[in-house]
């Protein structure tokens, strides 16, 4: 666990150099999951200096505990976005365990971090949040974008 934090912290300094205002971004971050087994439905991270060749962080093991951040115990389809302030990151993931069936996902998880190491999370279950949407069966691969004109972040899936 300590090695993972050291690797991610080192990467965060490379990736988030703009926080100081003196450095430019110097690496790419790729967030991913690896498969359909429970142990594979978790957020992993890899880093690249050129955008083509990536090295998995944390020995290709999860960097977040899916059991802690999700309602199902598994997460898939991570998408990460650097905020307009250049200092904050948002990640959104599907809250799902594929072993429960492909129509079992009703929620997404919203995550926020200032350092790519420490994350806060909130589960958004669409059917519970919006009672008139009971027929909504899937929240697949949510993504985030920023609308400069509206000055708001949006999630679509």
Located regions from the model:
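Sec-dependent N-terminal signal peptides
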Residues: 7-17
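Carbohydrate-active catalytic/glycan-binding domains of CAZyme proteins
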Residues: 22-157
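Positively charged n-region of N-terminal signal peptides that target proteins for export
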Residues: 1-7
């Amino acid at each position: 666990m300590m090695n993972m934090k050291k690797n991610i912290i080192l990467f965060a300094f490379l990736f988030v150099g703009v926080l100081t205002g003196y450095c430019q971004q110097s690496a790419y971050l790729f967030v991913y999951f690896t498969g359909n087994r429970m142990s594979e439905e978790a957020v992993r991270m890899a880093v690249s200096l050129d955008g083509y060749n990536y090295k998995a962080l944390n020995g290709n093991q999860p960097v977040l505990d899916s059991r802690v951040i999700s309602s199902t115990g598994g997460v898939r389809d991570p998408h990460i976005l650097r905020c307009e302030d250049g200092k904050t990151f948002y990640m959104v993931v599907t809250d799902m365990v594929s072993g429960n069936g492909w129509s079992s996902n009703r929620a997404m998880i919203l995550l926020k971090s200032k350092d790519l190491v420490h994350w806060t999370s909130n589960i958004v279950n669409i059917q519970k949040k919006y009672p008139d949407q009971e027929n909504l069966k899937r929240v697949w691969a949510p993504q985030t974008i920023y609308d400069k004109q509206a000055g708001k972040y949006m999630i679509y899936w």
